[in-house]
Curated annotation (Swiss-Prot):
Subunit structure: Homodimer. Forms a complex at least composed of DegP, ENO and HSP70. Interacts with G-actin. Interacts (via the DKSLVK motif) with mammalian host PLG/plasminogen (present in the mosquito blood meal); the interaction occurs at the ookinete cell surface and is required for ookinete invasion of the mosquito midgut. Interacts with A.gambiae EBP; depending on the Plasmodium species, the interaction is either involved in ookinete invasion of the mosquito midgut (P.berghei) or is dispensable (P.falciparum).
Cofactor, free-text remark: Binds 2 Mg(2+) ions per subunit. Mg(2+) is required for catalysis and for stabilizing the dimer. Unlike for mammalian and yeast enolases, Mg(2+) is dispensable to form an active closed conformation. Inhibited by high levels of Mg(2+).
SMART domains, sorted: Enolase_C, Enolase_N
Species this protein is from: Plasmodium yoelii yoelii
CDD domains linked to this entry: enolase (cd03313)
Keywords: Acetylation, Cell membrane, Cytoplasm, Cytoskeleton, Glycolysis, Isopeptide bond, Lyase, Magnesium, Membrane, Metal-binding, Nucleus, Phosphoprotein, Ubl conjugation, Vacuole
Main EC class the enzyme belongs to: lyase
Protein name stated in the entry: Enolase
GO biological process, one term: glycolytic process
Signal peptide region: none
Primary role: Glycolytic enzyme that catalyzes the conversion of 2-phosphoglycerate to phosphoenolpyruvate. In addition to glycolysis, involved in various processes such as parasite development and invasion. Plays an essential role during ookinete invasion of the mosquito vector midgut by mediating the interaction of the ookinete with the midgut epithelium and, further, by binding to mammalian host plasminogen in the blood meal, whose conversion to active plasmin promotes the invasion process.
Cross-link entry Glycyl lysine isopeptide (Lys-Gly) (interchain with G-Cter in ubiquitin), positions: 136
Domain notes: The pentapeptide insert motif is required for the stabilization of the apo-enzyme in an active closed conformation, independently of Mg(2+) binding. The motif is also required for homodimerization. This motif is only present in Apicomplexa and plant enolases.
Reactions catalysed according to its record: (2R)-2-phosphoglycerate = phosphoenolpyruvate + H2O
Length: 444
């Protein structure tokens, strides 16, 4: 039973801004949760409530979200059974907040950051009440098998561009994906060895300054285009000895360089007043992706087009979707209504699952199940602004999605998730298996 939800503003996430953390006091003890924060956010995401008071944290404070927990949510939680996850989530989202857009519940009154912190803490309390691990409890909530469980392939973001880096590179993330490993533990070893090899290659080619790391632990050397980044990755994978065992994934984050008036994409968007020679139409971008997939071992492309460019998403999925995972992040924002539209338009074939995009554990599970029911892949994801909370590590095992991206094997807030997955793999023993190259298949 819930006794008293306590909360604190002053924990920082990884970019040095405050975020919401909750301590949920129950008859079983105290259960804590902290929420992450994105940088390149989709316009259809549930609202992350910030104070916009420029005198505190340059407007990034979360006092209003904290106040909403204290004055609106907390009084309604006292005495409730923490095992009633769906009932409590729906109460917060639909009754206490109640804000809505054409895409569903928007959390614009209380803030998705306020609601999600409580939702995560309640989930942890529910697991304790059921005397089980968090990953098995969430699996039960989702109606999944808890006897044999799946460890995910890590998608390690090792080269940064786009809005995450100060270089010229337009595409936001280049990831290494160790699909050829026999276990999660070995996959992380493959990934770490490629990462350190890449660091040496970057240092030789671009200088020691180029090995500074970005928000997610990846490198941001002065790379000019995707070909250069991919050549560097292929060379590092080969030098580390993992050719054919480690593949490549990209997050383009194309909404960041889309011009809605001209319906074009500027691959030189970080150069002010550029000569427009790298401006592409949607079709030209489709052709570029097809060319890259033919030349490099790319198995997944996330956000290849703007969040409203349904037409070109569908073209690309039709062209290469059989062999390559086309992932919707800004396109879908973990929103079941957006997923339904994408299914109707055959726009993509995979969901990027970010719990803070939708704002409650119940809705995140719903988005995952809808995607899996329609034979999509699902990649569980961190945000670029993270805390040491490891909830998503348990979530990816619970939902059997077979793939997770939570940064490079660098920076403690990233490695915290990978370390939790090491622990889960160890605890499962023979009852856990590694997704490997079957990460796109239904592992239910």
């Amino acid at each position: 039973m819930i006794i008293n939800p306590k909360n604190y503003e002053h924990i920082f996430y990884s970019r040095g801004n405050p975020t919401v953390e909750v301590d949920l006091e129950t008859t079983l003890g105290i259960f804590r949760a902290a929420v992450p924060s994105g940088a390149s956010t989709g316009i259809y995401e549930a609202l992350e409530l910030r104070d916009n008071d420029k005198s505190r944290y340059l407007g990034k404070g979360v006092q209003q979200a904290i106040k909403n927990i204290n004055e609106i949510i907390a009084p309604k939680l006292i005495g409730l059974d923490c095992r009633e996850q769906k009932k409590i989530d729906n109460m917060m989202v639909q009754e206490l907040d109640g804000s809505k857009t054409e895409w569903g519940w928007s959390k614009s009154k209380l803030g998705a950051n306020a609601i999600l912190a409580i939702s995560m803490a309640i989930c942890r309390a529910g697991a304790a009440a059921n005397k089980t691990s968090l990953y098995k409890y969430v699996a039960q909530l989702a109606g999944k098998n808890t006897e044999k469980m799946i460890l995910p392939v890590p998608c390690l973001n090792v080269i940064n561009g786009g809005s995450h880096a100060g270089n010229k590179l337009s595409f936001q993330e280049f990831m290494i994906v160790p699909v050829g490993a026999p276990s999660f533990k070995e996959a992380m070893r493959y990934g770490a060895e490629v990462y350190h090899t890449l660091k040496s290659e970057i240092k030789k080619k671009y200088g020691i300054d180029a090995t500074n790391v970005g928000d997610e632990g990846g490198f941001a050397p002065n790379i000019l285009n995707a070909h250069e980044a991919l050549d560097l990755l292929v060379a590092s994978i080969k030098k580390a000895g993992y050719e054919n065992k480690v593949k490549i994934a990209m997050d383009v984050a194309a909404s960041e360089f889309y011009n809605s008036e001209t319906k074009t994409y500027d691959l030189d968007f970080k150069t002010p007043n550029n000569d427009k020679s790298l401006v592409k139409t949607g079709q030209e971008l489709v052709d570029l992706y097809i060319e890259l997939v033919k030349k490099y071992p790319i198995i997944s492309i996330e956000d290849p087009f703007d969040q409203d460019d349904w037409e070109n998403y569908a073209k690309l999925t039709e062209a290469i979707g059989k062999d390559v995972q086309i992932v919707g992040d800004d396109l879908l924002v973990t929103n079941p209504t957006r997923i339904e539209k994408a299914l109707e338009k055959k726009a993509c074939n995979a969901l990027l699952l970010k719990v803070n995009q939708i704002g409650s554990i119940t809705e995140a599970i719903e988005a995952c199940l809808l995607s899996q029911k329609n034979n999509w892949g699902v990649m569980v994801s961190h945000r670029s602004g993270e805390t040491e909370d490891v909830f998503i590590a348990d979530l990816v095992v619970a939902l059997r999605t077979g793939q997770i991206k939570t940064g490079a094997p660098c920076r403690s807030e990233r490695n915290a998730k990978y370390n939790q997955l090491f622990r889960i793999e160890e605890s499962l023993g023979a009852n856990g298996s590694f997704a490997g190259d079957k990460f796109r298949l239904q592992l239910n």
